[in-house]
């Protein structure tokens, strides 16, 4: 694809225009039953209570933690969708984040790591958005100057590197991967197969296909054949992690490859207004 693609705002506006020109073409996502989720949450909490003294303490604590965290998220706005970018050192995560936002929000540079604390981009500073940021533990955010109405429901977060030598950076990632609605893992051609991201993160969320995106970034540094080989290998690794239905795509901020596909996936997650519930349903299924 030639030239730099539009940011998320411009991409949404183009999609809105195309929808007006083609009113018969509609897209919809299957709904997740919130009432059914609430019943399963209640059942999980009850099972944890009944398991006290009978089951392994770690299992009881884990189930109770999932139930309490899910109930807390249910108490916040589910029209808001939280999307977080996580990734390895030097993978170009912050640069990709800026490209999607359409503004230089996150710091990107030569010194590593460049992201030391989570940074959010929001398109509307409402009480509901601020309450969600507080629950997430986000203390830094940028309000985008330009935006479309649909983006008011998006909270986009740039996380520190998961493989940073700074323990506080890894702690941030560990905290947020348990709470955000859609995870975008940004990996590079050199480290996409590292055991750390697969064993400590992706495999833990084997039931979270619908709310996981894995990006092989910086493919402009590879030949076409090598990029295809790396992407195929990454897809196989992600499937072995238990995420066979997760979106896996190639991207390059320099060439623009994959950025529109990534923006479309984020926009679809926001428009569906089901991503938060889908994430919680996967959490409960894992804990049950």
Region roles according to the model:
Residues 171, 219-288:
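C-terminal end of P-loop GTPase domains and the immediately downstream helical coupling element
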Residues 2-159:
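Conserved G1/Walker A P-loop phosphate-binding module
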Residues 29, 55-58, 168, 226, ...:
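Catalytic cores of large soluble enzymes that bind and process phosphate-bearing ligands
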Residues 110, 190, 276-280:
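Short, polar/charged, Gly/Pro-enriched helix-capping and turn/loop motifs at alpha-helix termini
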